[in-house]
């Protein structure tokens, strides 16, 4: 192999290694900031990781909201009409938050199976539903046995 070809091969090799290292670092940085979405059924089945930042979404169960009169602590239950997840949140809830409405909460699942929310987002209006919540609700309704009233 002549010296010029050898020099080009070394340069190309270093470039490939450098680009690979850069892509690897970018992927590692992005993966630590990704919050995966889970519906209440997946959380109840144990598919959601404990003590890792995730998103949980569904409908707020009617009659489930309880507020602490001494602080901003709120507890409520989220459902996908198949399973329920208890959520605790301390902070100011969005103006559009109410029972029977869709929400997406970001936080961590504790060892007792209670979702400790750090952020709660409510849907924008009566027609809007976050896409991941809508898919989760549709999936849960398809899987649920038919109910007769």
Curated annotation (Swiss-Prot):
PANTHER family: CYTOCHROME C-TYPE BIOGENESIS PROTEIN CCME HOMOLOG, MITOCHONDRIAL. InterPro entries: CcmE, CcmE-like_sf, NA-bd_OB-fold. This is Cytochrome c-type biogenesis protein CcmE. It comes from the Bacteria. It is a single-pass type II membrane protein. It is found in: Cell inner membrane. One of its GO terms (biological process) is cytochrome complex assembly. Residues 30-149 are periplasmic. GO terms for molecular function: heme binding; metal ion binding. The chain crosses the membrane at residues 9-29. Belongs to the CcmE/CycJ family. Heme chaperone required for the biogenesis of c-type cytochromes. Transiently binds heme delivered by CcmC and transfers the heme to apo-cytochromes in a process facilitated by CcmF and CcmH. Residues 1-8 are cytoplasmic.
């Amino acid at each position: 192999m002549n010296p010029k070809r050898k020099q080009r091969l070394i340069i190309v090799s270093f470039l490939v290694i450098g680009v690979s290292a850069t892509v690897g670092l970018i992927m590692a940085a992005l993966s630590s900031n990704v919050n995966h979405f889970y519906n209440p059924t997946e959380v109840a089945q144990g598919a959601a990781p404990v003590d890792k930042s995730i998103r949980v979404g569904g409908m707020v169960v009617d009659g489930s909201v309880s507020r602490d009169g001494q602080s901003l602590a709120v507890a409520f239950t989220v459902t996908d009409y198949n399973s329920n997840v208890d959520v605790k949140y301390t902070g100011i809830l969005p103006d559009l938050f109410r029972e029977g409405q869709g929400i997406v909460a970001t936080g961590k699942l504790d060892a007792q199976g209670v979702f400790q929310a750090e952020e709660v987002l409510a849907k924008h209006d009566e027609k809007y539903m976050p896409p991941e919540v809508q898919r989760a609700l549709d999936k849960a309704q398809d899987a649920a046995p038919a109910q007769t009233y």
